[in-house]
């Protein structure tokens, strides 16, 4: 009566990956990552008062902050820029602008180029 060999989620296996769906998923992941990266330092500071091990990790991080802080800023900046520019693209889609396949591919490439160029000008030049 029941077919044991059927896939659990056939909708994930029968379709090819599309660029628009991939960027939409990364938009959601970038929002969660941005929230986690911004909310975790105050929570870690609060938890460091309860545990000696957490306090030692915090002390190590603060003593090496000249190495950690620039990379932390770069990572948050890249995630923030991607999320904001992709959010603008989603607003354009909601207003039915650039919803055909050629425009979506062009907008995806433009999105990546903008994030790369802005980060290049911000941190290197």
UniProtKB/Swiss-Prot annotation:
Question: Organism source for this protein?
Answer: Porphyra purpurea
- Please state where this protein is localized: Mitochondrion inner membrane
Query: Mind telling me which GO cellular component terms the entry cites?
Result: mitochondrial inner membrane
Subunit? Forms part of complex II containing four subunits: a 70 kDa flavoprotein (FP), a 27 kDa iron-sulfur protein (IP), a cytochrome B and a membrane-anchoring protein.
Topology with regard to the membrane?
A: Multi-pass membrane protein
List the InterPro entries hit by this protein, alphabetically: SQR/QFR_C/D, Succ_DH_cyt_bsu_CS, Succ_DH_cytb556, SuccDH_FuR_B_TM-su
Cofactor info, note text = The heme is bound between the two transmembrane subunits.
Name the record gives this protein: Succinate dehydrogenase cytochrome b560 subunit
What gene is behind this protein? SDH3
Residues annotated to bind heme: 83
Q: Which GO terms describe its biological process?
A: mitochondrial electron transport, succinate to ubiquinone; tricarboxylic acid cycle
Q: Tell me its cofactors.
A: heme
